[in-house]
Amino acid sequence: MIKQIKYLVAGGGPCGIGAALRLQELGENDFLVLEKEDYAGGLATSFVDAQGFTWDVGGHVQFSHYKYFDKIMEKALGKTGWLTHERASFIWMKDRFIPYPLQNNIHRLPEDIFKECFEGLEKALANNSSNSLKNFKDWLLASFGEGIASHFLLPYNYKVWAYHPEKMQYGWIGERVSVVDIERIKKNIEEDKDDISWGPNNTFQFPKFGGTGAIWKSLASMIKPSKISLATEIDTIDSDNNIVTTKNGEKIEYQYLLSTMPLDILCSKISPMPEAISSKSKELLYSSTHIVGIGVEGPTPKHLAKKCWLYFPENNCPFY
């Protein structure tokens, strides 16, 4: 017997959980979330190891200027379930800690590299070559100059994306990268001060307990149990007949499929699929990573106590 569902949501990560909650909120009862793992949350999950350390495996710090999203976050953990931190992130390079963003704190670099970076900034701003940008590398060079790009932004982004910046476009940047305020930089140099307050997440909230995964675990628990099916992986999607077949052989007919799966995986499950789309889907680029957690017993060392996280752009270590 084929189960019939109006809204079938593929994936029980943040997007899938959000879709389900919104459907419930709108009074829609005819939906089902399919999640291949035996837990909800996707890559925004947190795990507790045998020693009691909590590890976030993907999504970590979040920030928002959307009232609805903020309301959902408060719904997840309540007003008292959060800690608020002032972001203090640092870069470990040239054998020293330098406050992030680098361009606002280049006076903390060795003298020769500081001069190279500052001169590169001024030259880049004077050139104003934004009309001739072809890729992410061009954008970095045009925005920050040769010095900052070569010492930090190019090697760091290659580590993060595992792909050369000259082969990436730059329309995704938005608020993710701090742009240049040359007058602010000059003031920091004159006053010899650290500048760490840039950005939309210069203060951020983090769950008191359970890591980032606590948010999505809580929100998933607000979905009616009958409306989320864990340990249920999609095997095939018959797009002509609107039928999903799961790995355990269950068939589900849907009116609307809301997919939160990676595009390449989604395309591999759809049949029939036009050959042109199928071949293009195999060319989609993506990166993967290994998450390594090291738990240290004892108090936080003084020189790390007020640092929220660190960036490692240099090639003398594999992590970033």
Which sequence ranges carry the predicted segments?
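Mid-domain catalytic core of redox enzymes
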Residues: L26, T232-Y320
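Dinucleotide-binding Rossmann-like beta1-alpha1 core, especially the glycine-rich loop
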Residues: Q51-N128
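Conserved Rossmann-like nucleotide-cofactor binding loop
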Residues: C15, D38-Y39, D264
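A general beta-strand register signal
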Residues: D49, W92, S229, T245-T246
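Local beta-strand N-terminus motif with an aromatic residue
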Residues: I5, D30, G59, Y254-Q255
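Glycine-rich FAD pyrophosphate-binding loop
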Residues: Q24-D49
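Active-site/ligand-binding neighborhood in enzyme catalytic cores
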Residues: R96, I113-S239, Y256, T260
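N-terminal Rossmann-like FAD-binding beta1-loop-alpha1 element of flavoenzymes
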Residues: I5-V33
